[in-house]
Curated annotation (Swiss-Prot):
Pfam families: YqgH. This is Protein YqgH. Induction: Expressed in both exponential and stationary phase in rich medium; expression is higher in stationary phase (at protein level).
Amino acid sequence: MHAISLHSLAYRRFARNVSLSMLLLMR
């Protein structure tokens, strides 16, 4: 359970970074 929560948090951070990079590229 704890590992899943950590994985979810890491995935959320990764998704946010990807979205930010995409926005910068599209700008």
